[in-house]
Amino acid sequence: MCQPQASQRAADEQRSSHLHNAMTRSPPIQPILEEGIDRKVLATLRARFLALSAARLERAMQGLSTRQQQAVQLLPLLFHVNHPLLPGYVSASTPAGLSGFEPDTELLAEAQRLTRSFTYKPLRGRPAQPIWGLYLMGSLGTVAQEEHSDLDVWVCHDSALDARQLDELRRKCDLLTAWAASLGSEAHFFLVDPQRFVQGQRETQLTSDDCGTTQHYLLLDEFYRTAIWLGGRTPVWWLVPAYEEHRYHSYVDTLLERRFVRAEDVLDLGHLQQIPPGEFVGAGLWQLYKAIEAPYKSLFKLLLVEVYASQHPQVHCLALAFKQAVYAGQLKIEELDPYICAYRAIEQYLRDRDAPERLELARRCLYLKVNRPLSRPPRNRNKSWQRVLLEQLVRDWQWDERLLVRLDDRSRWKVRQVIQERQALANELALGYRFLSDFTRLQQAASSVSRRDLSVLGRRLFATIERKVGKVEVLNIGISPNMAEDSLTLVHGEDAAGDLCWSLFTGSLNAHEWANFAPLKRTRELIPLLAWCHRNGVIDAGTRVSLFAGDSGLSELELFNLLSELRQALPLPLPPVDAQTLLATAQPRTVLLLVNVGLDPLDQRSLLQMPEDGAHSDPLGYAAARENLVLSIDQVQLSSWNELIVSRYEGPHALPDCLRDHLQNLPADAVDGLPQLQVRCFSRNRGQAIARRVEELLLEARLQLASVHSRYLLQVRQQFHLLERRPDSVRATSLNDRTALLAHLGEAHHVYRPLRLDRHALKGDDLRLILPLARPDCLQLFYRVRGETAELSILDECNALWCQRLPCRDEQQLLMPLLRFLRSVEYRRNARVSLHGDDGEAAFDIQLYRLHGDPGEPSASVERRPLPQGGTSDACYEVQAIVEPGETRSQVTLYCNHREFSELEYGARLCIAVAEHILSQRRDGERYPCYITDLDLSGMHGSGRSQTVQLLRYKARLEAALNAALAQL
């Protein structure tokens, strides 16, 4: 127990020193509460813990600079007094007074060296001492202490402090943090209210490696086995044997009630009897999350979490083992080192599971964490105690010098070493995730938060280590600080199977040398290899690349430009991905399109045919031959999950296929948050024009296909490519010629689908004038008269196209039959439409247009014409058709001026009979064409609704059959 006087403190330290020297011969202590406990036994136990703490503090000081040592030494005094001349001063009323503490002359002398005018005045009487304890947490004093290890300080305070006092105490801690930084120490002070802590309530993180309030018991375990006592009360947990942990509270109550210990001498932070399974999930998630960026430190801790979780519910944590060793008199400080104890537990766990590869990785993690390069001589003549301890471990592991050299050279590891290590790390990350997932499911330990975190972590792991088609593998998951090579050789040639590929070699090799070396990487295409080099930092701005392009057509200038574009479009390091982003589906963030890599679509012959007037300057239909200058596209896409994916498109469909996939990756109805798009082409001839055309096309297609059911028409040479946004995909249809295009545009689809044209599509074609005029719920009739023939086109209510060529002697005779038919369609439609308009259908509107001028000339135009007055409603010879489903085929019934002609009566002679009747009704037997004036297909469709284009097609077939029969008579 801390004594109020410096002389008593010195006596404590002297006793601790004697005990430290006699650690190996300390007898075991097994107090039994019911048999009574000698206070001397409790004093001995306390002295053992204090001796270990003092020994760790001494070792911690050895690893600190003189100024850093000063910061640690003065902390008890700085929390004991408020003095304007000392660091951390806020006000005279700031809570101060470290329980049971009085500074000795050496400490006061240290304070006066800091501030000469400072004089210490002992407090008289029994003043309040609201600072109950100061403890250093973490790796200080352990084998893993580094030169820049953080100082995590727990400031345990009186639970009675009010909000104002706590605020002043926090301000004091902030000032001390700044002061420690001026001495070269990164200090973090954490206020701990013991009463709230025991109840699992805390307001802030309690270590610089703390992930929140869900790890109460694991944090307490770490505190009890790593904390270094600086002053104040000592944990009452020290005085409760491990075999009494199950009745911790009653045991402590007895110690206090029987006055074996005084309440003002001890600090109660709780016990470690049982750790809830949810804590292992939370801790495992946190360590796994950090292991993706810094694997060695975090995987070691993750393995310890796995050890604990595997013991659930009877978890014998390391703090209890540490306490057992102290009671047993096993006080050798090296064996009680927190990291060594953790390693021993991990080693036993992995040996029991026959996992030698995982054990070797755990050893490498510990070795690299300790960071004492054993293949190199020590900095000083005398070896540090960490080095001596590590040398003993390495001898036990039977590591050879070559392995030590490789590990000590990690800062200079390049591709080959990183690839070798990445496999082991990726396997361990995957194993850790599966263990956590299985443990969560078996123990039903997942809260809604941990389920969400598991999902996020799974996606983060998937984005980092999982392989998939086109994805650039990330090698350097916190393994090496710099993988850039000084020089590389890039070769295009044949592989062992005789197939062409790109190979990357280290060093600057000539044609006679590279055959004798194994490449770092091979790929079929160039861009995946360059993207891999960039993403993994293998090539940076200072790397010299020797190029042997073979027959690829790649020049050194183009290679330089490609690498520069990758660096510009995808600057490294990539920004971290937050959890909210991982909860959503991965979306493209940056898209770089590289057109015609290593290709020049214009040879000298093509250059002679360059258009002079710009009429055929479109790269998708260039010159008189309408050449397509887009021969290949390499797409490099960075997703919102930081996945880099490379896709290649080549051949005549390269552009539409790339466009389809690009649009497929965009969310439907997306306006904001579209990925940044960059298009580059380094072809010698018209490279910039090609890139500009492709970029404009993609941006236009993005805009026009932003909503569901929208369509976009692109023409490449004489081929057409129609892209359509479906609810869950983008569909691309390639059409070889205009005939195929007309057939496709004439298909029924029962929902309005707007169609937008690329600015170069259908140039010189009437469709260029017609298609942009489409409107929903309209029947739009377009006609062009060419001498004695006319071309009719109809856009129906859903924007389906129907075309027909007819003889034309008179516009009225041309239009009236078709307009009568459309009126009957309109009538049937309007008869179905609810007066309230709540059935999803709208009434039709019929519009008439005439086309003028040559479609290839600027003078071409479309004129809106009024519907002919009268005519359509005048008396005429009615030919109505009703089509119904039959057992094997549809059944047609025709009505000629209300006289019925059915297949039941006439069979195969139906059309002949109707033709004869029609002919008999005409004056002088005139043989002009007959027309269907009304058609009902409602029985053929389950919905009862026929799209107009379907009616027009069936009408044309019936009319053809009737007119053929008429011609035979």
Regions found by a protein language model. Give the residues of each.
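Nucleotidyltransferase catalytic cores
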Residues: 1-112, 200-204, 220-969
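Conserved structured core elements
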Residues: 69, 128, 147-148, 163-170, ...
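Catalytic metal-binding acidic patch
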Residues: 135, 142-170, 186-191
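Amphipathic alpha-helical scaffolding segments
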Residues: 151-161, 168-174, 363-364, 380-391
